[in-house]
UniProtKB/Swiss-Prot annotation:
Organism this protein belongs to: Pongo abelii (Sumatran orangutan)
UniProt main location, coarse: nucleus
A molecular function GO annotation: RNA binding
Oligomeric form and interacting partners: Homodimer. The CSTF complex is composed of CSTF1 (50 kDa subunit), CSTF2 (64 kDa subunit) and CSTF3 (77 kDa subunit). Interacts (via repeats WD) directly with CSTF3. Interacts (via repeat WD6) with BARD1. Interacts with ERCC6.
Job of this protein: One of the multiple factors required for polyadenylation and 3'-end cleavage of mammalian pre-mRNAs. May be responsible for the interaction of CSTF with other factors to form a stable complex on the pre-mRNA.
InterPro entries for this protein: CstF1-like (IPR044633), CSTF1_dimer (IPR032028), CSTF1_dimer_sf (IPR038184), WD40/YVTN_repeat-like_dom_sf (IPR015943), WD40_repeat_CS (IPR019775), WD40_repeat_dom_sf (IPR036322), WD40_rpt (IPR001680)
Protein name per Swiss-Prot or TrEMBL: Cleavage stimulation factor subunit 1
Keyword annotations from UniProtKB, A to Z: mRNA processing, Nucleus, Repeat, WD repeat
Gene (name only): CSTF1
PANTHER family referenced in this protein's UniProt entry, alphabetically: CLEAVAGE STIMULATION FACTOR SUBUNIT 1
Compartments in which it is found: Nucleus
GO biological process: one example: mRNA 3'-end processing
WD repeat copies, ranges: 106-145, 171-210, 215-254, 260-301, 303-343, 395-431
Domain notes: N-terminus mediates homodimerization.
Superkingdom field: Eukaryota
Length: 431
């Protein structure tokens, strides 16, 4: 949403409206005090024009509509944190400690990556065993709510029809390291230690192999689709960021070598409007890029005091970047100024993390979540004031390597070196 520039005359008009409203409501002494302080150029008559303007603005302001949606259990993309206007927000969404495990799926090796589809209906998990699973969130919830006697009496056909794992994909020959759903098509992209990016058409139940692939020169570490679905960003063990045309597989890189990182790229993510993307690297820097020119706009040097940057994502309104590093700290950055506005600390009290994981928002961006590697628990903070909430024990038998939160619902997936992926959900009282 674009805002017009506010000038001195606009403020003078605002003060006159405030005085008129105060006079209309009978607060004469307060109005006179304001008149003596501001000294308006013309007489202010009692009026409730300000009240009508506010009511009209609230009825027609898309932001107000989105705000109302954003405080429910299910949200649409576009709502979220905005520190310019969120001073008095009452958090309504559930904190992490209120979630419970609803389903567990197992791989034959460490599970280290997961991703949600844009509508929050599907989750893909990837493993060191080179396999990929696609799970249906509604089926996982239904399975967890099913009485044990009903589950035991299911026929093989019923079990297959109701099974949460709707696809299992095999086409990599080494660990699956990154995953991304296409924004509009039934296509899943995956990257691997086998140096390939593969595209799977999961609309076909029988399809287990990729229909397209890109051969890279290094291990893939992070991928992100352009919101149109026509391009995909690829971060690898090499410091040079790649952008591929999905249809032609033509590769684009910045024309200025100085734009690039100095070490492996750990995280790449587009914002919702595709006019920017952000990268984080083992070199300790976060870079903000122009989504059209493919040039680096800003570099946040030593974003985590020199520690490796593990993740960097945009808030839904693209005003902020949420990052995490191997210093076990999450930070909220204001893009317009490059400042750290909020620091979320306490996840590494028993020692800094060794392995890469992510800081994520919940679906309403009321909370920031970050796994604590040593205690195998989930830290949760109020995203606006960094107040720590109750820890959630994640129930894994080994370190948690990945967390992804639903973009639309109170659910998230954790992936661990214990070979398992756990689906967590906060059921409402009506479920």
């Amino acid at each position: 949403m674009y805002r017009t520039k506010v000038g001195l005359k606009d403020r003078q008009q605002l003060y006159k409206l405030i005085i008129s409203q105060l006079l209309y409501d009978g607060y004469i002494s307060i109005a006179n005090g304001l008149i003596n302080e501001i000294k308006p150029q013309s007489v202010c008559a009692p009026s409730e024009q300000l009240l009508h303007l506010i009511k009209l603005g609230m009825e027609n302001d898309d932001t107000a509509v989105q705000y109302a949606i954003g405080r429910s259990d299910t949200v649409a993309p576009g709502t979220g944190i905005d520190l310019e206007f969120d001073a008095d927000v009452q958090t309504m969404s559930p904190e992490a400690s209120e979630y419970e495990t609803c389903y567990v799926t197992s791989h034959k090796g460490p599970c280290r990556v997961a991703t949600y589809s844009r509508d929050g209906q599907l989750i893909a998990t990837g493993s060191a065993d080179a396999s990929i699973k696609i799970l249906d969130t509604e089926r996982m919830l239904a399975k967890s709510a099913m009485p044990i006697e009903v589950m035991m009496n299911e026929t093989a056909q019923q079990n297959m029809e109701n099974h949460p794992v709707i696809r299992t994909l095999y086409d990599h020959v080494d660990e699956v390291t990154c995953l991304a759903f296409h924004p509009t098509e039934q296509i899943l992209a995956s990257g691997s230690r086998d140096y390939t990016l593969k595209l799977f058409d999961y609309s076909k139940p029988s399809a287990k192999r990729a229909f397209k692939y890109i051969q890279e020169a290094e291990m893939l570490r992070s991928i992100s689709f352009h919101p149109s679905g026509d391009f995909i960003l690829v971060g690898t063990q090499h410091p040079t960021l790649r952008l591929y045309d999905i249809n032609t597989f033509q590769c684009f890189v910045s024309c200025n070598p100085q734009d690039q990182h100095a070490d492996a790229i750990c995280s790449v993510n587009y914002n919702s409007s595709a006019n920017m993307y952000v990268t984080g690297s083992k070199d300790g820097c976060i870079k903000l890029w122009d989504g059209v020119s493919n040039r680096c706009i800003t570099t946040f040097e030593k974003a985590h005091d020199g520690a490796e940057v593990c993740s960097a994502i945009f808030s839904k309104n693209s005003k902020y970047i949420l990052s995490s590093g191997k210093d076990s700290v999450a930070k909220l950055w204001e893009i317009s100024t490059g400042r750290t506005l909020v620091r979320y600390t306490g996840a590494g009290l028993s020692g800094r993390q060794v392995h890469r994981t992510q800081a994520v928002f919940n679906h309403t961006e009321d909370y920031v979540l970050l796994p604590d590697e040593r205690t195998i628990s989930l830290c949760c903070w109020d995203s606006r004031i960094a107040e720590r909430r109750n820890l959630l024990s994640l129930g894994h038998n080994n370190i948690v390597r990945c967390i992804v939160h639903s973009p639309t619902n109170p659910g998230f997936m954790t992936c661990s070196d214990d070979f398992r992926a756990r689906f967590w959900y906060r059921r409402s009282t009506t479920d």
